[in-house]
């Protein structure tokens, strides 16, 4: 392993490591624009200049392009290197519009930071600036080409990493223009990553444009709830409104990126039609009154129908805390009808997959990226897990063949990321035995339990995509407490009432029961049909835990206070008819924010447990789940197989 010295600090790194990366391991930050850990080095920006004082190479060198070698003595603070970096910044700023006050990147802009750090403050260039006309790239990405510094990050990610073909660079040198051939929405399902990967303000989030500065945002480490992959994110909110979502690095999960669904699906949280106030028979009441009414109706229900006729239903999107407590509540009420999947077929498929993966055969997205063979079995990854498709592309770029097996594995998903895939009818046609790191990717939507069991006879690792962010956790709980056929129980009249906690129940089942209590944050059909509605907090309004498709428990943190967004508050919250408050807080003082009477789903279940005679619940994770209490939201998560 090469041993070198950087700023008087001895460093030892693996062969092939660049000087820039070696400096990072020693805690030394060398300014750079074009280098990115997921993309590698290209040497376009020339900002990472260092001076080599001794060793095989000497003089000013670009640290991102220079492999570390034995005997190197590197200085990042040599006056000659500092002068070089200062000149590079000045060159980059020659054509810059200097529009930081109106740029959404202000406060998180690398160009801004390095310009200040490099001491460039006086513009000496008196010539005419080069200018460009911006393109309309669709509803999500704002294009401001005049801020470009030609680092090539955007086109390298879009074309090489994500396999997009409708965006690239036109021209060369200072005339380079990063664009589509014609205006229009970017086609890649990962185009939103241009916002994160651009070191300046060329690509910004159009959905949050002019809404806040970086330092205005409330942010916390979180987990994407839009599929079972568990991509790590940083949601950003202001004034009780979720404005945007950014990717958070986790090498074991999503790497550096997220899909556009996870980035731009923020509207549901801000929806004014969300359940925000407890309702009893359509009338707004307090939480205490709603809980009193719930207990009274449950007692009346038991007297009328007897014990055991009430079903408790969770869902794949209910955080693990609520699912664990539902099992405890079922024991207190005395019902055997505890369900985590309203549809029987879905529950059976998830249970079969969880049983198959119980021996630790599950493949992470990191495993997929390093696989030497990938099989996509009866699954469309664009729908069931877009970031898994991006992981498959990285395996394909490294030489792994990709097989599409079955009628539910369309070729279009491979074409979306420019993969040359091989289509087959049955998995037995794939020569899995000749590969060392083969991975089979399948989903529970189109794979029956029998097909799942057939995978047990292969040596390949398996990546099973589930129907929700905590479907794996729900499957474990269902396996522990047993599965029931809810539809048959409702049809036969054995179930006459339902308490649904963040569950989407088919309309046919709802029509068969006279008593429904719904605790949810989405305006579902279950909520519309319920006699009692308890509004719960969305994932950005509370702490919680999701278990990903591979059995990895990950904690997400509360990002913002619950309540109606200040922008567009209903008229009843305005100070007066003459002083509407569409964009700033109303001048009315209240003890609770408008629409802010929301509680975590597990807290609602805990209240019922206590009112049914159970012990007070201060912590949902007890017994075998206790190890999850101290889960670090910024870590890689904990594999449930470990305990």
Regions picked out by a protein language model, each given a short descriptive name:
Residues 342-630:
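Non-catalytic alpha/beta scaffold blocks inside enzyme catalytic domains
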Residues 19-53:
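A basic, amphipathic helix-loop patch mediating RNA/tRNA/ribosome contacts
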Residues 67-68:
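Periplasmic N-terminal soluble interaction domains immediately after the signal peptide in Gram-negative
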Residues 1-16, 24, 36, 53-57, ...:
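N-terminal export/assembly segments and adjacent metallocofactor-ligating motifs
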Residues 176, 242-243, 553, 632, ...:
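Hydrophobic residues embedded in beta-strands of well-ordered beta-sheets
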